[in-house]
Amino acid sequence: MNWYELYWQRITPLHLFLWPVSQLLILFQSVRRFLYRRAILTSIHLPVPIIIIDSITTDSPVKTSLIIQIANILKAAGLRPGIISRGYPDNHRPPTRVTISSHPHLTGEKSLLLTYHLRETCPVWIGYDRIETAKALLNAHKECNVLICDDGLQDLRLQRDFEAVIVDTSVINSGNGLIMPAGPLRDSFARLKHTDAVILAGHQRRIPDITDEIRTIHTRPQKEHFFNLSWPELTADAAGLAGKRIHAIVCDPDTQNFLDNLEFLKLTVTPRVFPENHHFIATDFQSDEAEIILIPEEDAVKCLSLHDDRIWVLQQEYRVDPGLREIILKKLREKFMDPKLLDILVCPLCKGSLIYKKDRLELICKADRLAYPIRDGIPVMLEDEARKLPDEEEIK
């Protein structure tokens, strides 16, 4: 356990000194919410639906996996999602797209991890101002028709159409139960009454101050597996790696959690620990003794430029209640009932405008002569699902 995890779990004289600051922060956030609800402060409405995914604690290992799942849910439904994020807390840069070749020190590891898993199918942009970042993404990717905001729980300037808050109920993340800076909570549990869904991670099945009116979604870890960094399609379980000479490379503060996971998987490893935010180079992995080198997923994005077939990544995925898909799509159906939203959609191929045919529930691309169906209230913007218009069919 590192020093800040210990800090989150205890109550010391320093915590008592910081407790009034936490109370002032809660009061400030409550006043801001009141002012936005009364329209005294103005929030910004973007042209496409906004989905906020955030954690009530300072960090959650579930969030990245959850965002990837939601992006895949939206794509499977025929939508074209994009993702916006701050990237890292001290990011004061203008909106920037994250690509697979981006440097993790400039983009943040989690944003690069999202890009690594979603590749070119879902653009990821980071920036200090979430609204400006969203506008930049939509301007560069006109085919995007829904945005996922990785964080933004407390950014009330940004109007949201769906908001889900992750609550990690494990002891290490719930800690001393105090609000920052005295504890790991970013807001009080009472804040959860104003969200669309609460996603519980951990073994605890309920949390205080949650009314029955709030939809609670449960998530649980799936079986861990490894994938080869150079060849991601190659996967293995712990049994497939057992008996080999294994080195485990990890950066603080992830050391103990990573090594505990490997011990739980009954793998015998030789650990090598590097400082937090270490920039990996090829010589860090030079070892004639190691047949296999294991790294956590958070560090994998720092090693993409290294071409070493011995590097395998421990991936922990989380299975989410299928009900999450239904409540997200229900919210989006309500949004897409507005013809004004359908009017701004563009063809994903030519990026040209579409003609909404209400009688046929189709969106027509005149240039490519394609008709995209509106199925169960959701515009299915997939070429494979589009109807090719015959030459004799007139487009009006």
Swiss-Prot record:
It comes from the Bacteria. InterPro entries: LpxK, Trm112-like. Pathway: Glycolipid biosynthesis; lipid IV(A) biosynthesis; lipid IV(A) from (3R)-3-hydroxytetradecanoyl-[acyl-carrier-protein] and UDP-N-acetyl-alpha-D-glucosamine: step 6/6. It is an enzyme of class 2 (transferase). This is Tetraacyldisaccharide 4'-kinase. It comes from Nitrosomonas europaea (strain ATCC 19718 / CIP 103999 / KCTC 2705 / NBRC 14298). Residues 337-396 are annotated as: UPF0434. It holds the Pfam family Trm112p. Residues 1-336 are annotated as: Tetraacyldisaccharide 4'-kinase.
